[in-house]
């Protein structure tokens, strides 16, 4: 892979603190530096350096340092995005294990390698545009309570890929043995699993239906999507209506819902994940410990997670969403374009439309 330009992005800590009111955020002049380089045809190495004058930890989920086949970069060819064939994982930012964070002392660096051909088909070869953007939750000092976040956007780079070599890279996701597509996979969803998921789908259907109505005329649309455009309202309402319809199709929907980790992508702290390219949603063990219904606030319940995961699925509504941010405090800081493509903004709006 040849780089046409250097790829060095300095990331400043955004004044986004998840544990504080939005109008009373702690300020900081510290930051992070990320460098991405080629180490093979489609392999890349990311190096992140703590440029602050104090210790910090960053959440590795959905970053370059996530071991799972999550979306680490965006790839485009001939002006169109290359489809992403990996997973989108959902976690509760207020309930994460210590091992989900990577600590860095001042001046310390950490690096990770990954192969972009594991989650995208690059067998056509030729010239590709690579770029990345997102939000990295940060813990300042000891502990695991997220206190701020890094918002970053990299420069676009051009790379030349050997298509034949890229075609030899094995997909990061194992094949799962599945029956013909059904809404609920009865091989993994049995007994209490099936009953709990059926109730969650009913809850999610209610969330999505009320959100569709609120999207058309509600007064909190600007809060979550940073626009009041009638056309955007209509589009968001259409996504919610499609989600509600999917929730009401337990035996003939557009996705397959699994109650056990058939793709082996669960780990501690992960609640559920979606594989858009396979129209599959999978619940991880922590999902089954969530409350069935939450009546106020924005804490996740089983139905909330269903809305989040279904927002990812392009088989339900195109285009599917991604994960720029999680939780109310992060999500309401996104700009309109980011918010409209972020799964948790839809789940949060649905909660706001249904709860006290």
From Swiss-Prot:
<comment type="function">
    <text>Secreted metalloproteinase that allows assimilation of proteinaceous substrates. Shows high activities on basic nuclear substrates such as histone and protamine.</text>
</comment>
<dbReference type="InterPro" id="IPR050414">
    <property type="entry name" value="Fungal_M35_metalloproteases"/>
</dbReference>
<feature type="disulfide bond">
    <location>
        <begin position="189"/>
        <end position="259"/>
    </location>
</feature>
<keyword id="KW-1015">Disulfide bond</keyword>
<feature type="binding site">
    <location>
        <position position="312"/>
    </location>
    <ligand>
        <name>Zn(2+)</name>
    </ligand>
</feature>
<dbReference type="GO" id="GO:0004222">
    <property type="term" value="F:metalloendopeptidase activity"/>
</dbReference>
<feature type="active site">
    <location>
        <position position="309"/>
    </location>
</feature>
<feature type="signal peptide">
    <location>
        <begin position="1"/>
        <end position="19"/>
    </location>
</feature>
<comment type="similarity">
    <text>Belongs to the peptidase M35 family.</text>
</comment>
<keyword id="KW-0482">Metalloprotease</keyword>
<feature type="binding site">
    <location>
        <position position="323"/>
    </location>
    <ligand>
        <name>Zn(2+)</name>
    </ligand>
</feature>
<dbReference type="GO" id="GO:0005576">
    <property type="term" value="C:extracellular region"/>
</dbReference>
<dbReference type="InterPro" id="IPR024079">
    <property type="entry name" value="MetalloPept_cat_dom_sf"/>
</dbReference>
<feature type="binding site">
    <location>
        <position position="308"/>
    </location>
    <ligand>
        <name>Zn(2+)</name>
    </ligand>
</feature>
<keyword id="KW-0378">Hydrolase</keyword>
<dbReference type="Pfam" id="PF02102">
    <property type="entry name" value="Peptidase_M35"/>
</dbReference>
<feature type="propeptide">
    <location>
        <begin position="20"/>
        <end position="181"/>
    </location>
</feature>
<keyword id="KW-0865">Zymogen</keyword>
<dbReference type="InterPro" id="IPR001384">
    <property type="entry name" value="Peptidase_M35"/>
</dbReference>
<dbReference type="GO" id="GO:0046872">
    <property type="term" value="F:metal ion binding"/>
</dbReference>
<dbReference type="InterPro" id="IPR029463">
    <property type="entry name" value="Lys_MEP"/>
</dbReference>
<feature type="disulfide bond">
    <location>
        <begin position="266"/>
        <end position="284"/>
    </location>
</feature>
<keyword id="KW-0165">Cleavage on pair of basic residues</keyword>
<protein>
    <recommendedName>
        <fullName>Neutral protease 2 homolog UREG_03761</fullName>
        <ecNumber>3.4.24.39</ecNumber>
    </recommendedName>
</protein>
<keyword id="KW-0479">Metal-binding</keyword>
<dbReference type="GO" id="GO:0006508">
    <property type="term" value="P:proteolysis"/>
</dbReference>
<keyword id="KW-0732">Signal</keyword>
<keyword id="KW-0645">Protease</keyword>
<keyword id="KW-0964">Secreted</keyword>
<keyword id="KW-0862">Zinc</keyword>
